[in-house]
């Protein structure tokens, strides 16, 4: 009798397992995310926004060149000197760098522009998220987070490259012909644009976020980034619009600094 009960229980268990396997295998795949449906849900909309943060340039990494992971940016100037003569930063110091040499890290130029493109796309589409999924208050927060990030990406490039290309609000087709012939915006145009964008973004950002959202943009972050940008721009040594002459700073012969 006991053997019969055990056998019956074993068949029930096996049947349940087979049924569960069949139901799992019969599941329809989740709807793939596309440009048409990604903004239909709050979850996927937030995921898109969160991904824009990943385009933050890795300026904490010390390397200034692509084939070196231990040389800081200062090695590309006269602010410091290193004994590694086989590193590509010497091509800058020896004036042998040319456009065909891929020296600088990609994430100091290519990556910010990718982030700017993603921020533009998000800002143009976040309003498509239905109100039952995302209320107007949070929608405004999301929009201004992307606006802050876009301005921040510009602000991070300016200390490295000086004035850059301002894309504006529309996504740009980077494969179009003639784009490489476009002149850069002026320093003042870049600073004024970024400062205004940070100011406007600050108006629509919260003072703080719950702890689970630690690290997301806030009003204070936007205003702090704006203040730092304007502080640096006020220095003649930084913005370069008015070249400073040091010809009057001479030293006696054989003097050491």
Where do the language-model regions lie?
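Amphipathic alpha-helical protein-interaction segments enriched in hydrophobic
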Residues: 215-225, 229
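Membrane-proximal, proline-rich intrinsically disordered regions
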Residues: 21-71
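Acidic, serine/threonine/proline-rich low-complexity intrinsically disordered regions
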Residues: 170, 184, 237-246
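Short coil/turn linking the two alpha-helices of tandem helical-hairpin repeats
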Residues: 158-159, 165, 232-241
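Bacterial Sec-dependent N-terminal signal peptides
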Residues: 1-30
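Conserved, well-structured interaction surfaces
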Residues: 46-50, 54-60, 84-161, 177-192, ...
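Conserved small/polar residues in nucleotide/adenosyl-binding loops
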Residues: 247-253
């Amino acid at each position: 009798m006991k053997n019969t009960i055990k056998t019956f229980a074993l068949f029930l268990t096996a049947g349940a397992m087979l049924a569960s396997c069949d139901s799992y295998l019969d599941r329809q795949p989740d709807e793939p995310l596309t440009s048409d449906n990604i903004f239909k849900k709050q979850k996927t909309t937030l995921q898109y926004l969160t991904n824009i943060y990943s385009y933050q340039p890795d300026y904490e990494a010390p390397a200034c060149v692509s084939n070196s992971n231990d040389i800081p940016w200062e090695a590309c100037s006269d602010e410091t000197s290193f004994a590694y003569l086989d590193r590509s930063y010497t091509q800058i110091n020896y004036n042998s760098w040319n456009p065909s040499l891929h020296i600088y890290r990609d994430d100091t130029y290519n990556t910010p522009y990718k982030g700017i493109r993603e921020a533009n796309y998000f800002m143009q589409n976040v309003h498509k998220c239905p109100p039952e999924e995302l209320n107007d208050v949070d929608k405004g927060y999301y929009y201004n987070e992307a606006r802050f990030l876009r301005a921040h990406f510009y602000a991070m490039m300016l200390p490295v490259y000086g004035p850059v290309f301002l894309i504006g609000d529309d996504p740009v087709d980077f494969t179009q012909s003639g784009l490489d012939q476009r002149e850069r915006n002026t320093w003042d145009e870049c600073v004024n644009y970024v400062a205004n964008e940070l100011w406007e973004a600050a108006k629509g950002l919260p003072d703080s976020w719950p702890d689970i959202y630690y690290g997301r943009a806030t009003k204070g972050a936007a205003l702090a980034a704006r203040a730092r940008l304007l502080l640096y721009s006020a220095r003649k040594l930084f913005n370069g619009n008015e070249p400073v002459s040091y010809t009057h700073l001479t030293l006696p012969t054989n003097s050491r600094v």
